[in-house]
Structure formats: C-alpha cells, structure tokens
A protein has these predicted regions:
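Intrinsic-disorder/low-complexity, polar/charged segments enriched in Ser/Thr/Lys/Arg/Asp/Glu/Gln
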Residues: 1-7, 50-52, 65-67, 78, ...
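Hydrophobic ligand-binding cavity/cleft-lining segments
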Residues: 1-48
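Hydrophobic/aromatic beta-strand elements that line small-molecule binding cavities or substrate pockets
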Residues: 6-8, 37-39, 66-72, 92-99
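Hydrophobic pocket/interface hotspot
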Residues: 17-20, 27, 53, 70, ...
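Glycine-rich portal/gate segments that line the openings of hydrophobic small-molecule binding cavities
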Residues: 39-84, 138-141
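Beta-strand/loop substructures that line and gate deep hydrophobic ligand-binding cavities in soluble
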Residues: 82-130
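Membrane-proximal extracytoplasmic alpha-helices
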Residues: 131-135
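Short, highly charged C-terminal tails/helix-capping segments
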Residues: 140-150
Length: 150
C-alpha cells in the first residue's frame, strides 16, 4: 500500500492555500486525472467544516467515481480526507497548514492509498511517486494562478 509524506513551503498566504484545498468543486480544473468534482454536502461550524464530495478520476481507459469525506479542523489547520465508497480500498490524506508569515505557509501532506483492484494497485505502486509529485505540483501551480488573479 503506497504511503508518502512531504513537507513543502508554499510562497503563498495560508488562507489562499487553505481555500484552494477546500475548493473541491474546482479540482476538475487543475488536478491531474480528475475529470469531474462535486461537493455533495457541506456543514460548517465555528471550528469544523465537514464535506462529502465525489471525484471522478480517469486515466487512459479507466475511469471511476469515489466519494470522500473531508473534515477540516479550522483551529488546527488540519484537513483529513477519507474515501467512503468507490474503487479505493484505502484513501487517507492529511493536510496540515502552518503560517510562516503573511505571504508563505508550510504544507505537510500525507497520503495513504490502496485500490480495490489488485492489478491496478500494482500499477499504481509503480507510478505512485510520480503521481504524488504531480498532484502536489498541481496544487502549487493553482495557488500561483489564483495569486496572480488577485
């Protein structure tokens, strides 16, 4: 089961990165292999944001939808994502955001991923590092795009 952790400095305000990660409806615009994304439900309190969302992931001939449960602890700046249904046997990713200053933040990203299909899971294992880096870069590129748009 592939698992990876990275800590990276983003040259963008924490609030921009935070909003970007939670803007699931727009993942289809920038996230590799994401062909559609939609928030199904969202509840917000003063300390938590609770989201259920569907993401359609496609690569070559394979395409599938998985539903995820996203919990954002506003005070801890921690986002936890788990798969609820779909082709993923295991999906857990954790984002922890730390403000460095008004224009920079540190992003800790951990992903633990396993597909239900054994053959596809073996293929995933071989390209996991590449995919992980590509996904993280897509968030960084999107942050740059949003920063330049303001």
């Amino acid at each position: 089961m592939p698992k990876k952790k990275i800590i990276k400095k983003f040259d963008y305000p924490l609030e921009l990165v935070e909003n970007l990660i939670l803007d699931i409806d727009n993942y289809k615009e920038f996230l590799p292999w994401c062909t559609n994304s939609k928030i199904i439900s969202q509840d917000k309190t003063s300390t938590l944001i609770d989201i259920k969302a569907d993401l359609e992931i496609g690569y070559s001939f394979a395409k599938d939808i998985y539903r995820s449960h996203v919990i954002y602890d506003i005070n801890k700046k921690k986002i936890i994502v788990n798969a609820l249904k779909g082709p993923l046997k295991t999906l857990e990713n954790i984002w922890v955001l730390k403000k460095i200053n008004d224009n920079e933040c540190e992003v800790e990203f951990v992903i633990n991923l396993e597909l239900k299909n054994i053959i596809l899971n073996k293929m995933l294992s071989k390209m996991f590092d590449y995919g992980f880096e590509k996904i993280l870069k897509s968030f960084e590129d999107r942050a740059k795009f949003l920063s330049n748009s303001n």
